[in-house]
């Protein structure tokens, strides 16, 4: 396949909006080999491994842990071509990761591959390493059981800090395995808050503010405009760079970062407009559900659908996943996601329905703007709403 067929950086906006990034098209084996190399390099000489979601919340956890362990700072310099970076990290998936000076290693992971990250740390980490898992939650214990056991054999200690919705059986199994698991209230705390209060370390005010502003975006409070800057910068830049920039500057990002964010937001807003323009509203069991498709910033698109009257919103992505956002009127997003291979919070969840068997299914996904994915997620809404109607006592217990 010609490289230009899968490089999306120079695509017209209308096409970029409906196609996934370059990383989607790379073979799993190629990515796995690279991730092995990157993890091995990151763990060389490291005393601590932090497996974290590479969003602003997960990366704030890494910054807090590096501060607590008095890790060396490696502050990046502004690059002349910073603003020329491609659309998102998935368009540059093969960037080599050289050994770093850090004794607290960052191992990025998504909710769908946390078990792979655990296995790599078990394989490449030194005996007696301390392992932290941050801002990630397994849907089922058996998904991580073997890999967690291997990590526990290698590590001196394993701590897991999170704020997502955990099943009681999953949490108990993780604790029974020997993990120090702390799960915060997803309506009150982000994962950075959990790390901040769990570590026996006297953080200065800069890190307290980092946790607070990160929470502002992660819980979608939107009371501090700096939280949008953190979220966008974390999404667009390299995770390692983000961690070191917020360690140096806190939440008041330097001018060169602000300029970079401002330039990237021009395209971000255009992609949001594309997705909002495709939005439809459906009535399901007394609730209005907004649904759309596109590569975009899901929170802003969900907010636009809420303003149009949606009680809940679904943003289906070209890669096959979807974001589900709720409101005070509908707070069962994690239940909907749980029916379609996902999970999350009552008002913010994600999923990737297990409906893609081959590339023809994905081709249909792109050309129909996610029609099948939309249908199965809307069916999940119907099931959740019907279940709630049959068991009103459960709602009363939840509100008590």
Residue ranges of each PLM-predicted region?
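Short N-terminal binding/cap micro-motifs at the start of the first secondary-structure element
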Residues: 56-62
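Glycine-rich, Lys/Arg-enriched anion-binding loops that position phosphate/diphosphate groups
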Residues: 218-295
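Gly/His-enriched, cation/cofactor- and phosphate-binding structural elements
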Residues: 1-27, 44, 270-400
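Active-site flanking residues adjacent to catalytic metal/cofactor-binding acidic residues
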Residues: 52, 134, 161-162
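N-terminal small/polar loop signature for handling phosphorylated ligands or for N-terminal nucleophile
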Residues: 23-29, 33-39, 46-49, 74-154
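Catalytic PLP-binding core of fold-type I/II PLP enzymes
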Residues: 155-165
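Short alpha-helices
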Residues: 165-239
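Short glycine-enriched loops at secondary-structure junctions
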Residues: 54-56, 163-167
């Amino acid at each position: 396949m010609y490289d230009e067929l899968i490089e999306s950086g120079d695509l017209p906006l209308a096409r970029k909006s409906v196609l996934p990034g370059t990383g989607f098209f790379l073979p799993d084996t190629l990515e796995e080999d690279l991730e092995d190399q990157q993890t091995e390099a990151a763990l060389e000489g490291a005393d601590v491994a932090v497996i974290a979601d590479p969003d602003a919340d997960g990366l704030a956890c890494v910054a807090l842990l590096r501060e607590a362990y008095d890790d060396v700072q490696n502050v990046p310099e502004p690059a002349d071509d910073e603003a020329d970076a491609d659309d998102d990290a998935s368009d540059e998936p093969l960037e080599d990761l050289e050994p770093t000076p850090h004794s607290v290693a960052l191992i990025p992971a998504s909710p769908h591959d946390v078990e792979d990250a655990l296995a790599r740390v078990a394989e490449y980490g030194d005996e007696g390493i301390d392992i932290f898992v941050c801002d990630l939650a397994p849907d089922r214990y058996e998904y991580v059981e073997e890999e967690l056991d291997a990590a526990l054999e290698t590590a001196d200690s394993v701590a897991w800090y999170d704020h997502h919705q955990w099943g009681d059986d999953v949490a108990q199994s993780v604790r029974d395995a020997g993990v120090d698991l702390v799960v915060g209230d997803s309506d009150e705390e982000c994962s950075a808050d959990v790390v901040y209060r769990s570590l026996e370390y006297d953080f200065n005010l800069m890190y307290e503010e980092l946790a607070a502003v990160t929470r502002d975006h992660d819980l979608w409070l939107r009371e501090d405009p700096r939280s949008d800057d953190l979220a966008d910068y974390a999404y667009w830049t390299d995770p390692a760079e983000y961690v070191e920039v917020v360690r140096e500057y806190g939440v008041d990002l330097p001018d060169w970062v602000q300029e970079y964010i401002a330039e990237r937001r021009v395209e971000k807003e255009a992609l949001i407009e594309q997705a909002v323009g495709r939005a439809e509203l459906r009535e399901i069991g007394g609730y209005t559900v907004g649904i759309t498709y596109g590569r975009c910033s899901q929170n802003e698109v969900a907010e636009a659908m809420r303003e149009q009257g949606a009680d809940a919103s679904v943003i289906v992505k070209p890669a096959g996943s979807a974001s589900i956002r709720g409101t005070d009127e509908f707070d069962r997003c994690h239940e909907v996601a749980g029916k379609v291979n996902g999970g999350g919070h009552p008002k913010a969840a994600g999923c990737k329905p297990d409906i893609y068997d081959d590339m023809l299914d994905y081709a249909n996904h792109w050309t129909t703007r996610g029609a099948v994915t939309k249908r199965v997620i809307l069916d999940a809404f119907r099931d959740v709403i019907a279940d709630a109607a049959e068991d009103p006592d459960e709602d009363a217990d939840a509100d008590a």
